[in-house]
Amino acid sequence: GRRVSDTVEGDRRVARFVSKQPILGFFSVQSAAYEVARRQHGGVTLEIYYNPGHDFNVERMLDAMEAALDYYQAHFGPYQFDYARIIEFPGYASFAQAFAGTIPFSESIGFIADNADAENIDYVTYVTAHELDHQYWAHQLISSDQQGSTMLVETMAQYSALMVMKQLYGEDNIRRFLKYELDNYLSARGSEAIEELPLERVENQGYIHYRKGAVVMYLLQDRLGEDRVNEMLAGLLDKYRFKGAPYANANDLVGGFMSLARNESERELVNDLLKRITLYDLKADNAKVRKLADGRFETRIEVEADKFYADGEGRERKALLKDSIEIGLFTQKPGLGAFDKGDVISMKRYPIRSGSQDITIVTKTRPAFVGIDPYNKYIDRNSDDNIVATE
């Protein structure tokens, strides 16, 4: 809320805050000798409270808040406060957390982060966008206390942050974010103490609702359409905004995605990503290029593809893969710092089936690299073999 009084009573300082909007009984208190950076944006006062000398990323955070608010208000509805605050706290812990219009943010993951190297993930912007989105998913819409509840909180914030990153960095630079999330999910699966659950039944398992959730949501919006997904999510927010029981649950979200599926292939994809534990094994090999008589280049790529279903203890069985998956041709390897959309020669979906198959593509430019699912949108057990240099 807004500070309405600040007095000293005896030896105690007393500050009183009042919110004009409904909030949860869920808040935090930070008090320090802060510097404050402010910016006005669309009727909202953006504020960063930081330790003097820790201004390295303050402007980046303010820029991220602006970009996130613009995206969320355009697609999800009005932001409920006339302020948004980020408050630095010491690096005794490395997290940020969203309270009502107020985000405590560890110095170690934001304020003293080094983002100078283009090869690094801009996690300052990523985390800022994620936490600001919780003003919608957690503070406007509250999920029921049952399996799958964090899908409506953390997975939605991951999705929203990725959409902001896509808008800022472009579709062709999103691979580094997706690969980071994918690799973290895959490595964490082996440390599961009880049972891995499908996303729709996740039980506060961070590697599922954060890491897997980010990759799953990105693929769903890619296949079903970002605008269509956002329209469905906005409808869900409208239905439950600031309401008490009965609260939203994972069935609302899964049903929403299923309603967007236009054919059997898309329905199968929704089931695979949300209701099952599904793993893919996609590999590119033997990419050979020859110059044609008309000056164009013919690229022939060998693709190996498989799909597996796993149970909660990691036992796998093969499943039939029948999908349309992107094949990309590039002048530079995707994911590197210098890579951008100018390095993309061709990016199209092709029918992919279980097993080995050859795909032939003709382009005007000679590719240096070819890959299947080159931006790591699928839960691929080994994403390092998706891209291969041409011969």
Residue ranges and their predicted role:
Residues P78-Q80, G206-I301:
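Amphipathic alpha-helical substructures
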Residues T128, L132-W137, M156, S160:
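Active-site His/Glu-centered metal-binding helix of metallohydrolases
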Residues T150-L219, R223, Y240-A245:
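Acidic/His/Gly-enriched intrinsically disordered linker/tail segments
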Residues E88-G91, A118-Y123, S143-S144, E195-Q205, ...:
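Active-site-adjacent structural elements in folded domains
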Residues G1-A129, Y159:
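Hydrophobic helix-coil surface modules that form long, contiguous segments used
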